[in-house]
């Protein structure tokens, strides 16, 4: 009888499992336990094109392993290859199907795709009303892309035959005339064909009718079957950010249903995601609040307790505390959250937390946990970003002297990648393609690429000056020689690194002002194949000034006929209001550099005064309203504020001349007045949050012209008033004191209705930068009015950056903490690694409910690209947290 009961129960389970299947949920994607199929929930980006975050995608066991499903015209689509316009997306929940209509307008090609649930998998079918256009025969195909790093060390079965998936590309390719090539976006080319008029087509490394990716791994296994031939390509033969692409070519001369795939992800009805325990990878100060946030599968009931262990010298674990777990609830639809508070544990030592069998890595409780956390950023990351310098570290050369041929005047009526454009005039004395002398000095690479975005150089120079004056970090661990243009990391030279980096920025600003007349929009790579360059920046150009009288690749002395020099885009930087931030940077730098580099300081101030006199009247916002919106990449509008305020503040602080104070003081005071604006709960546009509320906050919160930049940009605000506070009279101080409570409440309200207590955002770009800016704004209040701000919120922000966040628990600052980001979108990303000390953008908010920051695929810039503009933010926040931690003793 017992055997019969067991048999019947087993049969019931089997029938129940068979009854399960993918279905379309209210958020309009296919869902079943451990499997989600997104069908154009996210679309391609018109500016940065194929970001590998769109199309038909599979999230399997919590990880997005497949992307880019759709009809494409290339075997292995690169970022800048064209994709179709999405004309329609029809969701039929009852039928379990999502139908998509597309258009390739350049080729009058309009395929349709139907994705339909089939058991625990789905089918993808391509329909054509007209045959594939002749030019696209052998080009158009149904694609599905797999992230390579997820499959390193795995295998594939093709019609039952086993094959190792390549860790590094070494496949077959062939050359074809460029007349056969599908044009890329902007009419540009990612391939440097050296004038040969040809391009590369990768060949498949396997083909068959049934493909099983990673059959040995339940987390990664996906099978695809079709009556039409399936090909597997390795896109890394063309581009390091390429993927494994499964592809079926659309047959020529056919209409109707021309291709159908049966796709089966790995499904387990009993699968439950392991808890993600969010905590600080650098540990906690004894007096600080210590709260771990548990990100849990919604099918995983919350346990009442977690266990905090103390790690002994012999490696044994001693239970220190049974930590109560408090359920928080669902956030952004996908997961449930709970919190474990062990703040009462103050004894210094090494600890780890265990919840339902999942353990964290060990972390310290210590007085000095923040003391050296910013050192990798200033010691390594920022020096590696220095343009026009050779950068050495021990036995390694990070890069040689780059862009010594800077720069050519960008041609008129020209637009290129990354949003750069030049209008009908150069606005300078230089003609199109003419060499602009003396620019090969100073500045930093903007981020993972090698452009100079002048807004970054101006902002970072100003921030470095403010950092020196406010927190004065005297650390000296970098040798910087501007005469020989040489940098040596971990080598003191007697001058504080902050001062030398400030000088490096101001040298480039001065060079632009003295040789062009103003700071330009950007100095950037002119071709696509230079733009995506990876490796040593000194090899992007030949370092020789372009001479049009020479043949391409011909070299005579220090000149060459190769037009690879960067372009200076001068269309947008010439606006009078655009020069106000330049004036502020020069004036601030002049003040801090005076004791160390008096000649550079004098040049900086001289140019600041000159620009003020030339642009003061024309920069009046009343005059500029007619030009609103005319700023390109690298310069922002001022949000209705007067950009002259910051320039006047810095000129006053440097020269002491009353006329500057007379100008800025009434404007700053006026901006302290409150106004009504929406605030509150749903900061990041997430699901399962409270509605936003209207509260009265100072107008100051709408924008920021403070030294830090990056978080809120625009005109002056309360940050400016706070920075001026100690230098002003009692009447000014009283006005600020009255404005502070509402301002502080507004800042603290931005913590948001989420379990982490920080303002999470990140649509298109991760929100870590905003969190640091939020922390800095609160710190600026706290150090003057400690009773107005809860300093724990500042520490909470840093805990988030260091690992107490959704998706994973790695530190978002590379090489800082126990478990840190393994990859980042830096210039060494081709090696799936990072430059120490960089801050990645963090969690990308993908529609409709998925947060992601991949740690095995560095090429998502919105998740992993470390930006130069964040370097000082990291230092400021680290020093602020150290100060707060000491105050909590």
What are these regions (language model features)?
Residues 368-392, 499-517, 605-623, 658-701, ...:
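Long, well-ordered core segments of solenoidal/helical folds
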Residues 6-16:
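Bacterial N-terminal signal peptides
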Residues 72-132:
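Extended, loop-rich substrate-binding clefts of extracytoplasmic carbohydrate-active enzymes
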Residues 123-168, 359-369:
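Acidic (Asp/Glu-rich), glycine- and aromatic
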Residues 189-215, 219, 282, 290-356, ...:
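Aromatic (Trp/Tyr) and acidic
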Residues 20-71, 171-201:
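Beta-strand-rich N-terminal accessory domains
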Residues 150-157, 270-289, 361-399:
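Low-complexity, Pro/Ser/Thr- and charge-rich linker/hinge segments at domain boundaries
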Residues 193-271, 881:
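Beta-strand-rich recognition/accessory modules
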């Amino acid at each position: 009888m017992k055997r019969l009961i067991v048999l019947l129960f087993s049969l019931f389970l089997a029938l129940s499992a068979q009854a399960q299947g993918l279905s379309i949920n209210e958020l309009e994607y296919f869902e079943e336990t451990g499997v989600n199929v997104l069908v154009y929930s996210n679309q391609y980006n018109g500016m940065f094109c194929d970001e590998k975050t769109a199309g038909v995608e599979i999230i399997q066991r919590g990880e997005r392993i497949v992307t880019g499903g759709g009809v494409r015209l290339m075997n292995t689509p690169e970022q800048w290859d064209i994709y179709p316009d999405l004309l329609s997306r029809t969701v039929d929940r009852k039928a379990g199907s999502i139908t998509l209509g597309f258009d390739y307008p350049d080729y009058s090609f309009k395929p349709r795709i139907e994705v339909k649930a089939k058991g625990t998998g789905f089918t993808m079918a391509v329909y054509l009303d007209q045959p594939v256009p002749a030019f696209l025969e052998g080009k158009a195909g149904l694609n599905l892309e797999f992230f390579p790093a997820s499959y390193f060390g795995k295998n594939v079965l093709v019609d039952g035959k086993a094959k190792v998936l390549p860790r590094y590309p070494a496949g077959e390719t062939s050359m074809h005339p460029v007349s056969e090539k599908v044009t890329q976006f902007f009419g540009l080319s990612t391939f440097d064909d050296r004038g040969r008029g040809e391009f590369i087509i990768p060949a498949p490394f396997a083909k068959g009718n049934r493909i099983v990716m990673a059959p040995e791994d339940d987390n990664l296994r996906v099978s695809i079957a079709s009556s039409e031939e399936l090909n597997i390509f390795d896109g890394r033969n063309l581009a390091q950010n390429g993927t494994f692409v499964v592809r079926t070519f659309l047959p020529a001369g056919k209409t109707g249903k021309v291709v159908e795939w049966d796709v089966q992800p790995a499904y387990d009805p009993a699968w439950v995601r392991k808890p993600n325990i969010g905590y600080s990878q650098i540990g906690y100060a004894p007096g600080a609040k210590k709260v771990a946030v548990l990100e849990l599968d919604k099918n995983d009931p919350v346990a009442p307790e977690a266990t905090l262990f103390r790690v002994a010298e012999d490696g044994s674990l001693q239970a220190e505390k049974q930590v109560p777990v408090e359920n928080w609830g669902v956030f952004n639809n996908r997961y449930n959250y709970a919190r474990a508070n062990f703040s009462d544990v103050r004894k210094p030592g090494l600890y780890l937390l265990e919840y339902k069998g999942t353990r964290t890595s060990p972390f310290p409780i210590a007085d000095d946990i923040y003391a050296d956390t910013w050192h990798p950023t200033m010691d390594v990351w920022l020096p590696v970003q220095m343009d026009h310098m050779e950068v050495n570290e021990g036995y390694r050369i990070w890069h040689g002297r780059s862009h010594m041929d800077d720069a050519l005047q960008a041609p008129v009526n020209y637009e290129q990648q990354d949003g750069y454009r030049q209008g009908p005039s150069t606005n300078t004395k230089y003609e199109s393609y003419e060499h602009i002398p003396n620019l090969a000095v100073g500045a930093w690479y903007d981020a993972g690429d090698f452009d100079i975005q002048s807004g970054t150089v101006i902002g970072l120079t100003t921030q470095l000056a403010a950092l020196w004056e406010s927190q004065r970090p005297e650390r000296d661990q970098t040798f910087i020689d501007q005469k020989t243009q040489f940098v040596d990391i971990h080598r003191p030279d007697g001058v504080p690194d902050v001062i030398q980096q400030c000088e490096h920025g101001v040298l480039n600003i001065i060079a632009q002002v003295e040789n062009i007349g103003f700071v330009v929009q950007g100095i950037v790579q002119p071709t696509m194949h230079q733009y995506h360059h990876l490796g040593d920046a000194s090899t992007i150009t030949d370092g020789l000034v372009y001479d049009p009288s020479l043949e391409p690749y011909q070299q005579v002395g220090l000149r060459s006929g190769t037009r690879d020099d960067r372009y200076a885009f001068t269309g947008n930087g010439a606006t009078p209001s655009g020069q106000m931030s330049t004036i502020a940077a020069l004036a601030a730098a002049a003040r801090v550099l005076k004791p160390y580099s008096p000649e550079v300081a004098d040049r900086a101030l001289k140019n600041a005064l000159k620009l003020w006199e030339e642009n003061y009247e024309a920069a009046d916002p009343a005059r500029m309203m007619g030009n609103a919106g005319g700023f390109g990449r690298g310069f922002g509008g001022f949000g209705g504020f007067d950009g002259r305020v910051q320039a006047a503040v810095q000129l006053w602080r440097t020269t002491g001349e009353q006329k500057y104070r007379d100008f800025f003081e009434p404007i700053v005071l006026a901006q302290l007045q409150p106004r009504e604006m929406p605030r509150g709960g749903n900061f990041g546009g997430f699901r399962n949050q409270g509605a936003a509320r209207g509260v009265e906050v100072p107008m100051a919160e709408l924008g920021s012209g403070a030294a830090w930049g990056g978080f809120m940009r625009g005109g002056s605000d309360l940050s400016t008033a706070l920075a001026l506070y100690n230098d002003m009279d009692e009447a000014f101080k009283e006005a600020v004191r009255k404005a502070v409570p509402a301002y502080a409440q507004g800042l603290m309200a931005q913590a948001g209705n989420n379990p982490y207590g920080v303002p999470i955002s990140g649509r298109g770009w991760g929100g870590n930068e905003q969190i640091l800016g939020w922390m800095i704004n609160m710190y600026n209040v706290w150090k003057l009015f400690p009773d107005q701000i809860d300093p724990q919120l500042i520490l909470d922000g840093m805990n988030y950056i260091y690992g107490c966040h959704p998706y994973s628990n790695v530190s978002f600052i590379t090489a800082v903490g126990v478990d840190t980001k393994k990859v980042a979108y830096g210039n060494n990303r081709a090696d799936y690694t990072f430059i120490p000390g960089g801050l990645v953008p963090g969690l990308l908010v993908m529609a409709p409910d998925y947060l992601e920051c991949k740690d095995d695929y560095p090429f998502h810039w919105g998740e992993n690209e470390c930006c130069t503009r964040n370097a000082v933010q990291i230092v400021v926040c680290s020093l602020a947290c150290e100060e707060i931690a000491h105050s909590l003793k």
